[in-house]
Curated annotation (Swiss-Prot):
Keywords: Cytoplasm, RNA-binding. This is SsrA-binding protein. It comes from the Bacteria. SUPFAM superfamilies: Small protein B (SmpB) (SSF74982). Residues 134-159 are annotated as: Disordered. Belongs to the SmpB family. It comes from Marinomonas sp. (strain MWYL1).
Length: 159
C-alpha cells in the first residue's frame, strides 16, 4: 500500500514588504533560504511576520537578514528565549552573494527583503538589489498609479 502524503496547510506568501516597492527601484531579485529555529517556523505557519524595515547586510562573506520581525506564538516554549528581531542567516550560492556584495558597495544601492513565502516545505526569502527613489520619483509613481486606477474606472463605466 502506498502512503498518502499529507499536504501542508500553509501555502503561498507569508509576508510582503510593500513599503520597499514604494521607496526603491527594484533592479534584480534573488531567492534565498533562511536559517530558522523551531518557534520561528511555527510562527510563520500562522503568518506572524513583518518585513517593513527588513534589509540584508553582509558580514564575513555571509548574508544576514536584519529588521525582520517574527512574532512568537503565545504557546511558545518557556525554556527557549524567543527574540523576534534577531538577525537571521540567508542561504545564497556564492555567485549570488558576490553579486550582492559587488552592487551594495556602490553608492545609493542596497539589498532589501521583499517577501517571505513557502516553496514546498521550505521557507524562502525574496531579496532584491534596489536603488533609493527620490521624492519626485515617489510622486510620479503615485500619479501613474492614480491615473491607471482612473483609466480602469472610466473603461469600466463606458463599457
Amino acid at each position: 500500500m502506498s502512503k498518502v502524503k499529507k499536504k501542508s496547510t500553509s501555502t503561498g506568501t507569508i509576508a510582503l514588504n510593500k513599503r520597499a516597492k514604494y521607496d526603491y527601484f527594484v533592479d534584480q531579485k534573488f531567492e534565498a533560504g533562511l536559517v530558522l529555529s523551531g518557534w520561528e517556523v511555527k510562527s510563520l505557519r500562522e503568518g506572524k511576520a513583518q518585513l517593513v524595515d527588513a534589509f540584508v547586510i553582509i558580514h564575513q562573506n555571509e548574508a544576514w537578514l536584519v529588521g525582520a520581525r517574527i512574532t512568537p506564538l503565545l504557546s511558545a516554549s518557556t525554556h527557549v528565549v524567543c527574540e523576534p528581531m534577531r538577525q537571521r542567516k540567508l542561504l545564497l550560492n556564492r555567485k549570488e552573494l558576490e553579486r550582492i556584495i559587488q552592487v551594495t558597495e556602490q553608492k545609493g544601492k542596497t539589498c532589501a527583503a521583499m517577501a517571505l513565502y513557502w516553496k514546498g516545505n521550505k521557507i524562502k526569502c525574496e531579496v532584491a538589489l534596489v536603488t533609493g527613489k527620490k521624492e519626485h520619483d515617489k510622486r510620479d509613481t503615485e500619479r501613474d498609479r492614480d491615473w491607471s486606477r482612473d483609466k480602469e474606472r472610466l473603461m469600466k463605466h463606458n463599457a
